[in-house]
Amino acid sequence: MKMKNNIFFAALSACLILASCSSDTEEPVVVPATLDCNGIEEGTSMQDDCGDCQQAYIYDFVSHNVQLLDDTMELTLGQTEILVMPNDPTNPYWNAGCIPVPSTYTFDRMGQSTVSYGGQTARLQMAVELYGSFSSASEAELLEMYNDGTGFSDPALNSSGKKLGNKTASYHYSSLVKPMFDAMLSKQANVVMPAVNAGTIAAPGVAGEYTGAGGRSVKVDEKGFELNQTFIKGMIGALCVDQIVNGYLSPSKLDPADNDPSGLGAGEYTTMEHYWDEGVGYLYGLEADITAPTFSGNGSVLLNKYAGKVNTAGDVDMNAVYDALKAGRTAIVNMDYTERDAQGLIARELISKILGVKASDYLRGGASELGNTTPDMAEVIHDLSEGFGFVLSLQFAIDGSGNYLFTKEEVDAMLANLEAGNGLWDIDAATLNSMADDIDARFGL
């Protein structure tokens, strides 16, 4: 018992934060040397609970599993397991201290920022230029920008090594979804723009340009789809949400073995820290200052733009998303993976909700216009082309339990309804409202 007491007394000299870190800034309570900071006699408990749980545990250095302990008596270790006492520096998760959740998304090591998502900023910039090239670029030029990451006006983008195509639906249904985006680019260049340039007036079954009574002009394929809208709204889900929700913030991506800060210098980051930041970058990568995101004036055509819209409308609280992202990144620094996953799930669910809100909004917008005595078909087409892209995106959204809200088959069925017959030229309001009702029910809107 004396040896056990000595082990525990030595363990009080520092804190290993496994489950969470204390942010208590009050002066430490002076206690007798034989008691821990909760007044428990040394050696009588495996917990040294100085504010939050700091326990001895078993660590498996192959599977990286952790088993908290209340007692080490009669303990048998497996061949790949080690016993780690509180604050033992041999612990692969060793962390000499903890940090509180910052007021802004600001993290550093030795005074230099560790937040980095330059690759995400580059891809978002690529999306802006690609979207702006739909009416002027050839098929080869559009596909080069999308798949090769070259052909942009900014030499820095061309030499970045980043691409949009290889990140499209890369975590979910890539082989089935990615070709849809290639096809949109090809059809825009080979079908829509030749008809527009020839002065063809779009009509059911005829690609070209159509101007509505309100003055809006739309460049559409034979089914009435604005392919620039179906493409870019689809990329909100297939690129941004898939990368965030199903990739960088997903527990399956965040292996504790990738979060060893030992030996890191000023401004250097662990792989897990960087993964989290990369996920954040798909939302905030075009913001001038991530410490004060505005969701406006940054040229975004993807997730950030619509995050601002739903935040302004009160449909999704983006402050809650920001807080969860800060708390999750803090938990990574503190090696509190339970908290990391809890905060990650909050952010992932709320970001997913953006897709449901906008898909429903655009479908109902089209249905509302169709309900007029003389619908403005340019407005219908524009709303429903955007709606098509958001519906396509729904297969990447999750609920509060981390489960997908729609299967690919369900999404494909909705897309088929929009494409049936002459597509948007003869869709009816009842079909649109029924689809929107289903989306609302799934997301709890």
Q: Predicted regions span which residues?
A:
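Primarily marks secretory-pathway-exposed extracellular/lumenal segments that are disulfide-
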Residues: 6, 21-74
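Sec-dependent bacterial lipoprotein signal peptides
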Residues: 1-19
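Generic hydrophobic/packing signal
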Residues: 20, 36, 49-55, 272, ...
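Mature extracytoplasmic or organellar-lumen-exposed domains after removal of signal/transit peptides
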Residues: 61-445
